[in-house]
């Protein structure tokens, strides 16, 4: 797992994600990913708990990308430290 408490690593990822998704093509790709990963749908599948877990994982990918798009590297590092995600 990537160490999101390391500011140097986070700055690099932040730069790459923003370079990718803050373009017209990147925004179109994000819209596609949101639709494909069920971003706007409930993750709960009352008939299949494994499907709920899969749905949550798909949405986690989008949430992570959006976190990098909507927050500064410093904010991301602070959030990771708060969650204790430094030893991945």
Predicted feature descriptions by range:
Residues 1-88:
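Intrinsic-disorder/low-complexity detector
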């Amino acid at each position: 797992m990537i160490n999101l408490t390391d500011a140097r690593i986070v700055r690099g990822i932040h730069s790459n994600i923003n370079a990718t998704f803050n373009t017209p093509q990147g925004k179109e790709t994000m819209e596609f990913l949101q639709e494909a990963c069920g971003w706007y749908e409930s993750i709960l599948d009352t008939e299949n708990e494994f499907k709920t877990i899969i749905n949550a994982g798909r949405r986690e990918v989008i949430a992570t990308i959006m976190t990098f798009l909507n927050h500064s590297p410093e904010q991301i590092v602070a959030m990771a430290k708060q969650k204790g995600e430094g030893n991945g």
